């Protein structure tokens, strides 16, 4: 059977419209979890204020020089802030991926679904999803640090891994290997969707500061919710595409 991107886009749009409120609630819950965890594990405001003390920002030629000019205590604060942001983001993304994929599975099986039920049903697979998303994020970031393009290619090749892990109950490394093989064979169908997702995320990042006009916390929740909705659309597309490829 010939698969066209247009038909998968149409199916994705229909599913997203029909399940919008459930997907929105999952996205909002994941955004709230991300922001709360980030706040809990981040350094205090007083500690963050120390990062500006005695650091010659104007004289630093890059991030590496800036970090070198920091005191050991400031470096520890920066490391804690980075770790808190990364950890909370990974947790939120794992719950989002599990919740959205479970919504699709439950709806496809003709069952009624709610945001809490979808997240609860995804609980057994969340540890594996967390490890998978951590590894894929690490690979993509390493690729972006090299020359950007390798990171984008890795993001495309690994896109189907979460769907395979949940739908076929694969292991973490098996889903990574299978995703790379299957995506490479169907690059024309996967690449445009992933590139559109990356572009949408980049545009959202550029305008993220405007959300802080309300309060930093509410702005962070709104920005994360929109980011989660964008990711949810991609997950729906990838799930539908994967099911068609398997037929």
Curated annotation (Swiss-Prot):
Residue intervals passing through the bilayer: 20-40, 87-107, 118-140, 152-172, 187-209, 225-245
Subcellular location: Cell inner membrane
Chief localization: membrane
Ranges per topology, Cytoplasmic: 1-19, 108-117, 173-186, 246-247
InterPro entries linked to this entry: UPF0259
Membrane side Periplasmic: residue ranges: 41-86, 141-151, 210-224
Superkingdom, taxonomy of origin: Bacteria
Signal peptide segment: none
Membrane topology: Multi-pass membrane protein
Key words, A-Z: Cell inner membrane, Cell membrane, Membrane, Transmembrane, Transmembrane helix
Family recorded in the similarity comment: Belongs to the UPF0259 family.
Protein name in UniProt: UPF0259 membrane protein YciC
Source species: Escherichia coli O157:H7
Gene that this sequence comes from: yciC
